[in-house]
């Protein structure tokens, strides 16, 4: 055989192989490549959506944290105000209680002073009557004595 005939036969076999490959082998390979490219594109799109969803979730979490911090600081401020109010009320109650106790003590002292004065008046009246009786050495009438005591009490 001649080199031209062999070359021609190889060319025919080559083109036959190319035709067979293009007709029967290439379409399933191209279809598989297209499907894989679609899956990769879909995966990339899903990753992009996931990334944007993650960023949105981070923003929302940051907002919720800020809101939570604000609420906590507000609660702390309210608690501090309430504590200050309770302390102020306790001070006012203690002050009014102290004033009440002082007034009661003053009233008790005045009452004891009044009792002491009355007792002293009675003792002075008794002493005056005894002194007058011893000076006069006479018997005094009981009704006159009572009148004298009352008069003396009133004068003292």
Curated annotation (Swiss-Prot):
Record keyword Acyltransferase present: no
Keyword Cell inner membrane attributed: yes
Localization per Swiss-Prot or TrEMBL: Cell inner membrane
Gene3D superfamilies membership: F1F0 ATP synthase subunit B, membrane domain
Topology versus the membrane: Single-pass membrane protein
Principal cellular location given in the protein's record: membrane
Listed GO CC annotations: plasma membrane; proton-transporting ATP synthase complex
One of the Pfam families matching this protein, by short name: ATP-synt_B
Disulfide topology: none
GO molecular function, one term: proton-transporting ATPase activity, rotational mechanism
Keywords: ATP synthesis, Cell inner membrane, Cell membrane, CF(0), Hydrogen ion transport, Ion transport, Membrane, Transmembrane, Transmembrane helix, Transport
PANTHER family for the chain: ATP SYNTHASE SUBUNIT B, ATP SYNTHASE SUBUNIT B', CHLOROPLASTIC
Functional summary from the UniProt entry: F(1)F(0) ATP synthase produces ATP from ADP in the presence of a proton or sodium gradient. F-type ATPases consist of two structural domains, F(1) containing the extramembraneous catalytic core and F(0) containing the membrane proton channel, linked together by a central stalk and a peripheral stalk. During catalysis, ATP synthesis in the catalytic domain of F(1) is coupled via a rotary mechanism of the central stalk subunits to proton translocation.
Subunit text: F-type ATPases have 2 components, F(1) - the catalytic core - and F(0) - the membrane proton channel. F(1) has five subunits: alpha(3), beta(3), gamma(1), delta(1), epsilon(1). F(0) has three main subunits: a(1), b(2) and c(10-14). The alpha and beta chains form an alternating ring which encloses part of the gamma chain. F(1) is attached to F(0) by a central stalk formed by the gamma and epsilon chains, while a peripheral stalk is formed by the delta and b chains.
Family: Belongs to the ATPase B chain family.
Protein name per Swiss-Prot or TrEMBL: ATP synthase subunit b
Organism: Neisseria meningitidis serogroup A / serotype 4A (strain DSM 15465 / Z2491)
Native organism taxonomy: Bacteria, Pseudomonadati, Pseudomonadota, Betaproteobacteria, Neisseriales
């Amino acid at each position: 055989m001649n080199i031209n005939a062999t070359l021609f036969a190889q060319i025919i076999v080559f083109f036959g192989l190319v035709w067979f490959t293009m007709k029967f082998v290439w379409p399933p390979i191209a279809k598989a490549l297209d499907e894989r490219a679609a899956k990769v594109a879909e995966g990339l799109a899903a990753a992009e959506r996931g990334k944007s969803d993650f960023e949105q979730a981070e923003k929302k979490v940051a907002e919720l944290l800020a809101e939570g911090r604000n609420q906590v600081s507000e609660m702390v401020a309210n608690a501090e105000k309430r504590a200050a109010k309770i302390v102020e009320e306790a001070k006012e109650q203690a002050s009014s209680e102290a004033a009440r106790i002082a007034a009661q003590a003053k009233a008790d002292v005045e009452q004891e002073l009044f009792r002491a004065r009355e007792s002293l008046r009675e003792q002075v009246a008794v002493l005056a009557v005894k002194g007058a009786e011893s000076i006069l050495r006479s018997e005094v009438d009981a009704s006159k004595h009572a009148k004298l005591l009352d008069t003396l009490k009133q004068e003292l």
